[in-house]
Amino acid sequence: MSLNSFKRALWLYHINAGSCNGCDIEILAVLTPRYDVERFGIVLVGSPRHADILAVTGPVPRQMVSRLKRVYEQIPAPKVVLQVGSCGMEGGVFHESYNLVGPVDQIIPVDVYVPGCPPRPEAIIEAVVKAWVKLEKAAEQRIT
């Protein structure tokens, strides 16, 4: 199995569940010429219906629960969810907020965690590669 066996570009959809935007800036940094992940076929898309990977930043407030579930359901199978940043795992700076429901993995299943506040772009790229491998394994299981 190689990363070349995925026949098209890997499409990533990003949703901010309520972060401070630090993680969002690092996701955008991955797309800049310094890292240029598009040369490897990793593309940010504007619709969850086109995505292979869902990248979620921030903790989940009450207002985002139904939207996050709806976005997750719109992504076609096989799909992988990345939790980017410490806020979505434990609350981070928003830990004691009255409006938080909890970490992302209590709302939707998370496959790959990217810790950090904010995580480095290299860590995000490494997580996307792990997600890519999981997608390939899921695609192989569907074929066989």
Outline where the language-model segments fall.
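Iron-sulfur-associated redox domains of electron-transfer enzymes in respiratory
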Residues: 1-144
